[in-house]
Amino acid sequence: MAMSDKKDVVLIGAGVLSTTFGSMLKTIAPDWDIHLYERLDRPGIESSNERNNAGTGHAALCELNYTVQQPDGSIDIEKAKEINEQFEISKQFWGHLVKSGEIQNPKEFINPLPHISFVRGKNNVKFLKDRYEAMKQFPMFDNIEYTEDIEEMRKWIPLMMKGREDKGYMAASKIDEGTDVNYGELTRKMAQNLKNSPNVEVQYKHEVVDFERLSNGKWSVKIKNLNNGQVFEHQTDYVFIGAGGGAIPLLQKTGIPESKHLGGFPISGQFIACTNPQVIEQHDAKVYGKEPPGTPPMTVPHLDTRYIDGERTLLFGPFANVGPKFLKHGSNLDLFKSIKPYNITTLLASAVKNLPLIKYSFDQVIMTKEGCMNHLRTFYPEARDEDWQVYTAGKRVQVIKDTEENGKGFIQFGTEVVNSEDHSVIALLGESPGASTSVSVALEVLEKNFPEYAKNWEPKIKKMIPSYGESLIDDVQLMRKIRKQTSKDLELGFYDKAK
């Protein structure tokens, strides 16, 4: 297929994934027509919003669920390597957007912040030390520090050590080159850049309501203008569904075979936010603990310094909260409307297989503020009720699907790319670490669904992401070079301690 073949692409949803994919596509295929439709009145309102997500640069520096203890006691860090490389890829793309002038003021969406792991108990301390020993041997993580010394911990996490009377087994590890990322602000910047670009149309308060496959192979997308109630149709070659929790219902409306035997289980996140500036100023890190035994990885608690609206904040959580909505601004009928004759056995099988997760979720629902505060005090013993308030964050929809390997009703953690056989429909489903790995997800979409353009697009992608086609895991010199460059481009001020 010749590069002169002009195509039309519809992007659904103005979150971080759609705006990332759109930003990339308009650069490598500037003559293509791109139409982005968002049902809300502005971009980044749902899961991408800074108040609705965990806000971390998921780089596997402190998240302990990415480093798994094996039956022989060893620590497998392969997943951590993969996640870290993906975040480095994201930073390269963001740095390109800044250098090219497409977005400005990187400090408004990314700031340096130490990433720390903190554990208590003999077994957890041994796990963290073994993890440290495994990670420091690998160049990607060789700047990791570890301590069991209380005085050192007082320097790293002074707020958490205040009033701590349990002087038993405790340990912490730290990597200074972590970040806090405001994905809402990043999304807004990318959306505005798209709106200002030729051959790109961005429409807010426009809801995609249905699809029809045409005899010429194209899709007729039915769109409702929520400003005046008018419905119109738009013909397109490709449909990209990046609508967060709304992706599964939209995918089902396409009727493609790949939309069958898929379901979703909606979970809200709740955090408690500190309202006392004097407390907020005493903590300067993102601190992860270890998930309680028998609970899913999304339950890992963390105490996070966050930068929101230019101000420093402090959040603790998440706590799960189940409900039928697939989106924060969704309908209480979302879950029930997604149950179809072709996926009901998938959902029922999942319910039987995942009773502990369901029990955990409902236990969390009935947790009061007092319960949240008691959990917080395992991190910050002197926490006072009057300094904290509970708020509901965004929705995540855990993907439930049938697989050959895991049978019916398997719950998929992470981000899932689903596409039609002819690659005309592409949907992004799932959750964490989606935002942090959004650039790698966009690259996967390009490689998987547009192979005929790969040769022509590669030089342009390489300009945006210098490590494209190479491994930051295997090539240590390239990894160090890229980190130094992105630190400069994004004004992070990091330096590589490794020799």
Curated annotation (Swiss-Prot):
SUPFAM superfamilies per record: FAD/NAD(P)-binding domain (SSF51905)
Catalytically driven reaction(s): (S)-malate + a quinone = a quinol + oxaloacetate
Gene3D superfamilies: FAD/NAD(P)-binding domain
Coiled coil: none
Segments passing through the bilayer: none
Domain of life: Bacteria
MF (Gene Ontology): 2-hydroxyglutarate dehydrogenase activity; L-malate dehydrogenase (quinone) activity
GO biological process, one term: tricarboxylic acid cycle
Cofactor(s) the protein requires to work: FAD
Disulfide topology: none
Annotated metabolic or biological route of this protein: Carbohydrate metabolism; tricarboxylic acid cycle; oxaloacetate from (S)-malate (quinone route): step 1/1
Enzyme class: oxidoreductase
Keywords for this protein: FAD, Flavoprotein, Oxidoreductase, Tricarboxylic acid cycle
EC number(s) stated in the UniProt entry for this protein: 1.1.5.4
Pfam families noted in UniProt: Mqo (PF06039)
Classification via PANTHER family: L-2-HYDROXYGLUTARATE DEHYDROGENASE, MITOCHONDRIAL
Family: Belongs to the MQO family.
NCBIfam families: Lac_Quin_Ox_NO, mal_quin_oxido, PRK05257.1-3, PRK05257.2-1, PRK05257.3-2, PRK13339.1
Protein name (record): Probable malate:quinone oxidoreductase 4
